[in-house]
């Protein structure tokens, strides 16, 4: 049995930026502190939502180190360190671990992709380079590559491969992973609209985009489930759905970064090629925030 890196709601946190595109560390610090005050169970820095794909390694490592130092062991800090180049990924994993991250979030190789055997070799090499627990990240809609349940089982045999963020949207696949891996691979939902379904299959929590705007909602949903109040967990899951729709009306993190600006945070804009949401989607986002009761009067 492997103890989970965290249990509950981990926020896939945005990276606030100044007008010139540089990282606004002061605002990142304020957002992190607000997350901790409102119940977030883990901070996931430099993931998809944090715009790691348009950061240099130096920027990514600086954001990881800043967050690790600020959080100071209050909750786990999980560092995005994925790459489609195994050698580069191993170097980034080692440097992220040296920054003090508690675990690594490693996405599947994208664009060049690989075979299932290649996934085993890639993730094994990166896990050993980092030397800290690894959460695999399966998001085939972005990468064009799916981690098959049988591959997840093979990877779960490695002592450092601790969990999987499952964002395939395929509940049947998640059930098969749970059946094959048991307690050797901790499952986290990668989709905010599937938190309770994955918890019902033995999942340990969620890596959440919605938590950026309403962390207590996602935390309380997970807590209710683990406390045995499944009716409350279900109700809170359903309460999330309008926010889920709004925050994924365009490719993540375009909507959530706009939402954070609406809420008064100095989130800034996304780096190109991501641009502002359309006017219609801005209205949808604002209406969802209003309905969720998070817009300050």
Regions found by a protein language model. Give the residues of each.
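Glycine-rich phosphate-binding "P-loop"
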Residues: 138, 160-161, 271-272
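Active-site beta->alpha loop and helix N-cap motifs at the rims of alpha/beta catalytic domains
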Residues: 2-11, 15-144
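C-terminal alpha-helical cap/extension of soluble enzyme domains
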Residues: 5-16, 38-40, 200-203, 207-297
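Short, amphipathic alpha-helical "lid/cap" segments that border enzyme active or binding sites
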Residues: 25, 29-32, 149, 282-289
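Alpha-helical structural signal in soluble globular domains
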Residues: 62, 66-71, 95, 99, ...
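Catalytic alpha/beta core domains of metabolic enzymes, predominantly
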Residues: 128, 142-248
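Short Asp/Glu-rich motifs
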Residues: 54-55, 89, 115-116, 146, ...
């Amino acid at each position: 049995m492997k103890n989970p890196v965290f249990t509950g709601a981990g926020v896939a946190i945005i990276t606030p930026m100044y007008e010139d595109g540089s990282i606004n560390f002061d605002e990142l610090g304020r957002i992190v502190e607000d997350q901790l005050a409102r119940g977030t169970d883990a901070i996931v820095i430099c993931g998809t939502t944090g715009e790691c794909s348009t950061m240099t390694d130096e920027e990514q490592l600086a954001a990881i180190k800043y967050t690790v130092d600020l959080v100071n062991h209050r909750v786990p800090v999980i560092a995005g360190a994925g790459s489609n180049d195994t050698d580069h990924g191993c170097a980034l994993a080692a440097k992220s671990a040296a920054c003090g991250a508690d675990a690594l979030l490693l996405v599947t190789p994208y664009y060049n992709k690989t075979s299932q055997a290649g996934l085993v070799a890639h993730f094994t090499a990166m896990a050993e380079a980092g030397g800290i627990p690894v959460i695999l990240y399966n998001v085939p809609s972005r990468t064009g590559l799916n981690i098959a349940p049988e591959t997840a089982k093979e990877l779960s045999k490695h002592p450092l491969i601790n969990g999987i963020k499952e964002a395939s949207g395929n509940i049947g696949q998640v059930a098969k992973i749970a059946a094959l891996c048991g307690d050797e691979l901790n499952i986290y939902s990668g989709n905010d609209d599937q938190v309770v379904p994955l918890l019902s299959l033995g999942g340990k929590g969620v890596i959440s985009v919605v938590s950026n705007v309403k962390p207590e909602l996602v935390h309380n949903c997970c807590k209710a489930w683990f406390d045995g109040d499944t009716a409350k967990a279900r109700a809170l899951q359903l309460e999330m759905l309008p926010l889920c729709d709004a925050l994924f009306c365009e490719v993540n993190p375009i909507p959530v970064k706009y939402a954070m600006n609406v809420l008064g945070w100095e989130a800034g804009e996304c780096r190109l090629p991501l641009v502002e949401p359309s006017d219609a989607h801005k209205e949808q986002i604002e209406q969802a925030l209003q309905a969720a009761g998070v817009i300050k009067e």
